[in-house]
From Swiss-Prot:
InterPro entries per the UniProt record, alphabetical: Uricase, Uricase_CS
One annotated GO biological process: urea metabolic process
Record-linked Pfam families: Uricase
Name of the protein: Uricase
Length: 296
């Protein structure tokens, strides 16, 4: 061990552990599929595996991978927060020198296909415009912390948004607009209250909360007469926190994907202001607005 350095922090695990699980309803024979990417990170009395090459305290990452697969086979995975918590608790309970586990799950969304006007029993279509994630940490003797996410939802509205009365200086060239296209890719994290026990956590309907967070986000985006991205994202977060007492904090990152008016004056065509109907999508640069709203 060096006399001048020490291990300030360490964790290790397995990433990109992918699986798809198929559930079949005994009554209807209807199939449901769940595709997930899982990452595990363990913490505890691990310093000597770094400083003294002591592998006796290393639970192999391959063991962690196998554990994830066995737990996926033998347990319900339909609620990713609960599945992640069960895995995290297992790692800490089983290995005495492991005192914490962080599990991250990313869900690949498959939507049931409609065929001849009816939901098909075993055919699905990939929904590329939405990513659900969860991050669950279990600490020995302290309980669970859960942060879930809605990401990669690309939205646009063609009116109902403006940007005026902003600060101006010698570097300002942006004109004020009372009507503009508002487009963004939604990135939302929502943090739950601390859970002392697995039983308390398992009693929460995380799936319906996820759907409601998405509904509030999209409804606010569509209905708000937006004066700025900042004002709209605050309304989204404020509504979520006031709807769910179990959610203590909401974070949004909303890149402002610009669509600018195309100047057709050289062709004697007015395509500016209220006469604008033709826009040029801008790949970059884009605005990038973030906000974390917390319960008082």
């Amino acid at each position: 061990m060096s006399e001048t350095t020490y291990v300030k922090q360490c964790a290790y695990g397995k990433t990109l552990v992918r699986f798809m699980k198929k559930d079949i309803c005994p009554k209807t024979k209807t199939h449901t599929v769940y595709e997930m990417d899982v990452q595990s990170l363990l913490t505890g009395e691990l310093e000597e595996s770094y400083t003294k090459a002591d592998n006796s305290i290393v639970v192999p990452t391959d063991t962690q991978k196998n554990t994830i697969y066995v737990f996926a086979k033998n347990n319900d995975v339909s609620v990713p927060e609960v599945f992640a918590a069960k895995l995290a608790k297992h790692f800490v309970d089983k290995y005495k020198h492991i005192h914490g586990a962080a599990l991250d799950i990313t869900i690949t969304p498959w939507t049931r296909m409609e065929v001849q006007g009816k939901p098909h029993s075993h055919s699905f279509i990939r929904n590329p415009g939405e990513t659900r994630k969860t991050h669950v940490v279990f600490s020995e003797g302290k309980g669970f912390d859960v942060v879930s996410s809605l990401k990669d939802v690309l939205v646009l509205k063609s009116t109902g948004s403006g940007f005026t009365n902003f600060h101006k200086c010698e570097f300002t060239t942006l004109p004020e607009v009372t009507d503009r296209i508002f487009s963004t890719s939604i990135d939302c994290n929502y943090t739950f209250k601390h859970f002392d026990t697995f039983e308390e956590l398992a009693g929460f309907d995380f799936n319906s909360i996820y759907e409601k967070v998405k509904e509030i986000t999209l409804e606010t985006f569509a209905l708000d007469d937006s004066e700025s991205v900042q004002a709209t994202m605050y309304k989204m977060a404020d509504t979520i926190i006031n709807t769910y007492p179990a959610i203590n904090e909401v974070y949004y990152a909303l890149p402002n994907k610009h669509y600018f008016e195309i100047n057709l004056a050289p062709f004697n065509i007015d395509n500016l202001g209220s006469n604008c109907s033709l826009y040029q999508p801008q790949a970059y640069p884009s605005g990038y607005i973030t906000c974390t709203v917390a319960r008082k």
